[in-house]
């Protein structure tokens, strides 16, 4: 079993809002991994005095502990408990009902001698490499599948870059984030109930050779710059390591016209070879 990971801020002048960790028991018969991508809020008040890096460190640490030690709890239950624990840590000082309260996308996986379990929430990704080398992406596509009116606003921002257009798009997206009627998409913030909306699953341990967890700053290699498919991305990381993928993304970002939004995003890659 081998773990290899890298995480890098998009801007060296800003704190990294991604999180990555893994735990392997002394027995060597299982493990768990967690990757989070903290959501950078727009400029202005977000109701929290701590900030996104604090939040992802708290949430990620709690989630890894629970996933690694509470085999009696499903991963969705682990996420719900981790969200509740993190919320309790700043409930008395911060406005957890603020729509921009710190939040994050989530990938968590856990394995033992019998099963491999996974959970994905929002637009970070988990790639599962089967015993025969086939690669299957586990994705939560709800953020990518926004309503037509919101997609139209997004396209307008990409065309114009105008501040007013961007503000309108941000407001529309915020209205869909963790929408109670299920019409939008979900991120882990202060409501433990969000865990029920995650993409979850499991498969026999014998059917899985490796796992690759990535934030969207790393999946740009496939999803933004179209440098290869998911199988090609996994092959690159297998052969050259997580750092090579991040370096390729940074090169592509520099060579292409600036993206609307962030030129460089925090990027995290965690490879877990189970055999």
What do the PLM-derived regions correspond to, one by one?
Residues 1-275:
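PP2C/PPM-type serine/threonine phosphatase catalytic domain
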